[in-house]
Amino acid sequence: MPFFVKTEIIKKDYLINNDLKRKIINEHIDWVKKLKKEGINIKSGFLVDELNKPGDGGLLILEMNNYRNALKIIKNDPMIKNDLVEWKLNEWVDPNK
C-alpha cells in the first residue's frame, strides 16, 4: 500500500496566538491517536532546526490505498479544518519497488 506525506507550515497569524495554536495542536494529536486505534498506519510530528527549536512546520505520513482516500482522511485533520496551516499532500514513491 502506498504512503502519503503531508507537509505543513503554521500560518503566521497563529504564531502570535499560542493558546489557540496549542488547542488546535492538541486536537490534532487526539485525532492521530484515534486513527491509530482504528488501525490506520499514521505518523505525525513537528520539525526542529539545528538548535532543536520548533517552528519550521510538520510532517504527517499516512499509509493508504490511494490519493483520494488519503486526502479524505487528511481533510479531517483539525489543523486543516481550523485553517492553522498551509499544507500539501503528496504520494511518496519508492524507486526500488
Question: Residue spans of the language-model regions?
Answer:
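Conserved, structured core segments of small domains
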Residues: 1-97
